Amino acid sequence: MNKLLLAISMLFAAIVVNADNNTSAYYNSETECLGVELDGSQTLRVWANGRNKTDAVEQCKKNAVNEVIFNGIKNGNGGCNKKPLITEVNAKEKYEYYFNIFFKDDGEYKKYISMEDSRTFTKKRLKRSEQVKYGITVRVNRGDLQDRLIKDGIIKQ
């Protein structure tokens, strides 16, 4: 009986010692509003995964523009426009060719992103097995982006 109790105790101790203390699964990785500038641009905290830092940061920039266009910014201090630029149902699929070109690497989306609000320590890093997850602060020029989408016939005025 003592040996069985000792074996169960050791097994329990081994499980407790090897428990994963990783808190990254609980980290909020939704885009959030940090503020709105007088020119209508929105300062956002955006998260993305990538193979390395460069990939993750580039994906963050794409995610920021994508959120403003298709989802609106619902989290954060509430200053950002919660309404997406495109409210049409299935617009992403309807204009897939346009947005594939728009969001390609070094694509047109970069014209509407600014890193002016990035400061030291504004990048946060979480490491996973094969990928890294970064959160950065970016500014999206919503007004110019809206003008571009109107000019290109994606949204109506």
What are these regions (language model features)?
Residues 1-22:
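Bacterial Sec-dependent N-terminal signal peptides
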Residues 19-157:
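Domain-level marker for long, solvent-exposed, non-transmembrane regions
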